[in-house]
Amino acid sequence: MIRSRARAVCTSWCPALALAVLAGCGEFKWDRPPKPPPEAAPPQRAAVATDALVAGSIAAQTYLADVEPLALRGFGLVVGLGDKGSSDCPSVVREYLAEYLTKQIAPQGGGRRPKLSPEELIDSLDTAVVEVVGYVPAGAPAGMRIDLQLSAIVGSSTQTLEGGLLLPTELRLFDRAATGRGMIQGNVLARAGGPVFVSPFAAADPRKGYVLGGGRINEARPLRLILVQPNYQLAQQMERRINERFGPKPRVAEAVSRGFLTLKTPPAYAAEPDHFRRLVVRLYLDNQPGFVERKVQELTRAATAGEVRLEPVAYAWEALGRNVLPRLQPLYAASDAGVRFYAARAGARLNDSAALAVLAEIAAARGDPHRLLAVRELGASNSPQATLPLVPLLSDADQEIRIAAYLALQEHNHPAIRSLPFRCVLDRAQLNCVLDLVECDGPPLVYVRRTRAPRIAVFGRQVPVHAPVFYRHPDESVTLVSAAETADVKLFARWGRKLSDEILVPPRVSELVSALADVPEPDAAGRLRGLGLPYSRVVQVLAQLCEDGTIPARLVVEQTSLTDILGPEDTPERPETDRDPPPGADAAPQPPEEPARDEPLLPARPKQDAARGTR
């Protein structure tokens, strides 16, 4: 059958390719010339600022360069498309892929050879050549994962990328002006691969998709700190101050010339390179106790008088270090909500447990304008006590607060969330999706991620699937049926011309998702474990069942924004919308614009039953 042929192709190619690519990681460097690059002409600006916030800081005499996201591009092969792929491929890309795939397999030697040669694989209708684009944020550390955008080659006859698997792919600097072999030349800066997510909603282009967290950066991407007035002694002074604050090993700052320093994100900030970028420029060159005392007083007066924006002040407090805590702690009780939050934020980042208690109060206070930020700040803390106040917020009346608390707790692997991973049918080493069961009170909620990792979170206690159930996908690839309220839900799939065995599951959302997403293999009793549907198809089924009331829950899809690529602004927001298209919905290969914050569009609707009336 079609699915069987796709599985055979992947079985023969994927494991060997994965081993070869892993063995080759770390052999490549970022594109950089052998000598320091020419120093950019400084912009027309004052060399030294005089206001209380900036005067004496690194920001007063420098500016950061290389802060835009860096676009990477590569060409790869998606397998597992049945007969919906194509053999269309530009000759230059075809030659490159054939050579690359051959080299990756050759070192294995002595093992099982693939059933198809690279050329035959490219020509198969089970595969499609795609352009792969990813964005590396400023200051990204080595090993950081990035989302990928995939597009079928323009002009090809590929019908869809849904259900496919991107074979290991090389990513290089994206030169939009490059043509011919120039498109595939340059150092390999990242590796890519994984299951493809195609938006299941009607407006999406099935020839475009995402691989969530599918790119891995080979080496850290440094920043450059440019001196407005080049001076090597000053550059060295800044180097010493930065390394003193963030630790000399591994080396964070290096004065390359009189005109600039290079900065690498320290390990403590690996998950938040934007945090480091905003903090480092707020360092003051003078670190003597007398200066610190005077500076704290200046900053506090300016903040409480409303003379400055509070976000930069909070970074300045944090940059001064733990010596500021005695002056900062009285502000935890400030009458001004903004001063209170930002003082507590700075204190929490300086490991003050009293500040965490204040953030917990803000997070729990309905109506506080900094509530969502407090939840995220608690989630970013490494302190074990920071997660405790987040658990009750899973049941909060505010949907955004519930989701933010879940995201924070999930990052900490908190026991309040039980995670069930499901492997990819085409390659068991890859992840199809993760089901997070969030045991909490409050209205049932289904939350779907569209960045970083394919995750579905189900909020509630034993969220039911109401009968009668009848769902059939438009292409008849999956069918769900249940007649009685207490009856099990019957599922089966169509693989080519063959029907799968039936699966019976209790009428609960957790059981239903497991049956849809798990691999189609027998369990210990010989029964089929799952249908092996791709993440996008699982989301599509859930969306329809939530919309018609079969599942009494809202379906909320994470909405990506410019923040996901560039990092948060001074007051970050991650809007969430109901039934907003997941990744790949007509997304151009470039950073999206910051979306407006939307109200929920899809509340849980009562299911209509002609015989019994409204549920």
Where are these regions (language model features)?
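Amphipathic alpha-helical scaffolding segments comprising HEAT/armadillo-like alpha-solenoid repeats
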Residues: 290-301, 322-333, 352-364, 383-395, ...
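Beta-strand/loop-dominated core regions that host nucleotide or nucleotide-derived cofactor-binding catalytic loops
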Residues: 26-73, 79-298, 304-309, 320, ...
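C-terminal motif of bacterial Sec signal peptides marking the signal peptidase cleavage site
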Residues: 21-24
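Structural detector for internal amphipathic alpha-helices that build alpha-solenoid repeat scaffolds
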Residues: 310-320, 330, 340-352, 361, ...
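Active-site proximal loops enriched in glycine and acidic residues that flank catalytic Cys/His/Asp
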Residues: 265, 332, 345, 363, ...
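Short inter-helical turns and helix N-cap capping residues of alpha-solenoid HEAT/ARM repeat scaffolds
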Residues: 306, 335-336, 366-367, 397-398
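Ordered, small/hydrophobic-rich secondary-structure cores
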Residues: 224-244, 248, 337, 344-347, ...
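Bacterial N-terminal signal peptides that target proteins for export
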Residues: 2-14
